[in-house]
């Protein structure tokens, strides 16, 4: 039993479960804290009133992607429930298209008021999110399974990046680095480039 617990495969499995648990908890916190925006009250929406429908599309689509994403990447679920996997995959793609489109509009309207670095970094993240999702869908249609799995994983990394950067702004360490306008662009960049790099290094190893 001791040898099994120290085996690389066992440690990798436990690490994946730990990462999955952290992602699910962080996503749940993010979803709960975003629900107040659906009150449609101007005093709650603030500067987002003119683009509220894009904001709602971004949040609702993002929620759909967050919920369906883990089951798409879970190999046991894919093998056992293929029809459900396809249906959930369509929901995921539609959710990302809505959410990424909303993010691009928000990055063009609300974000420049914070800083151009923040606006540009959000544009890039939303484009990567949308692009990787469409490539995951395209490779699935062509039955290029290995490529599909890789692009689907990259897509979900971009999905989680929106949660990661939103929660990172509330960390005391990030707050000490500077004002929101000063650190926002860097935080958004790091939220997806670091995990994306780590995934591709692990994939090629």
What role is predicted for each listed range?
Residues 1-205:
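Alpha-helical membrane insertion/targeting regions
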